[in-house]
């Protein structure tokens, strides 16, 4: 069972690398102007489905999610041409909110405990 997890992790890594190259080259939707970053990929143990977590700069996340999920079957076939797997998992794109969450926490911490440059000068 331990080998199964290692294999799914390797496949997830490979899918992440390949999709990072395929998406900017293959998706020609004019609504997709922002830079899409694949932050994580989680592959099911049976390799039937893959959740693709992404972030995007300067774009509406719901629009980009719809674009990517609409192009999922095309991206799956493009992925199948570039990797050697018996079956390529179905792709499900999910916006990764962890980056925004981290930035929000950082802002809250800075509000509560603002960095004080004058105390550094006095020491």
Curated annotation (Swiss-Prot):
Lineage: Bacteria, Pseudomonadati, Pseudomonadota, Gammaproteobacteria, Legionellales
Gene field: rbfA
HAMAP family, per the entry: RbfA (MF_00003)
Localization per record: Cytoplasm
Keyword check for Cytoplasm: yes
One GO term (biological process): maturation of SSU-rRNA
InterPro entries with a match to the protein in the record: KH_dom-like_a/b (IPR015946), RbfA (IPR000238), RbfA_dom_sf (IPR023799), Ribosome-bd_factorA_CS (IPR020053)
Stored PROSITE patterns: RBFA
Main subcellular localisation: cytoplasm
Quaternary context: Monomer. Binds 30S ribosomal subunits, but not 50S ribosomal subunits or 70S ribosomes.
Protein name in UniProt: Ribosome-binding factor A
Pfam annotation, one family: RBFA
């Amino acid at each position: 069972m331990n080998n199964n997890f290692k294999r799914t992790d390797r496949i997830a890594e490979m899918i992440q690398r390949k999709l990072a190259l395929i998406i900017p080259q293959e998706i020609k939707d004019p609504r997709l102007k922002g830079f899409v970053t694949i932050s994580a990929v989680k592959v099911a143990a049976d390799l039937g489905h893959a959740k693709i977590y992404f972030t995007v700069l300067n774009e509406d996340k719901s629009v980009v999610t719809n674009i990517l999920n609409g192009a999922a079957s095309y991206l799956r076939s493009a992925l199948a041409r570039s990797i050697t797997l018996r079956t390529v998992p179905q792709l499900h794109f999910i916006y990764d909110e962890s980056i925004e969450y981290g930035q929000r926490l950082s802002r809250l911490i800075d509000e509560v405990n603002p960095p004080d440059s004058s105390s550094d000068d006095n020491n």
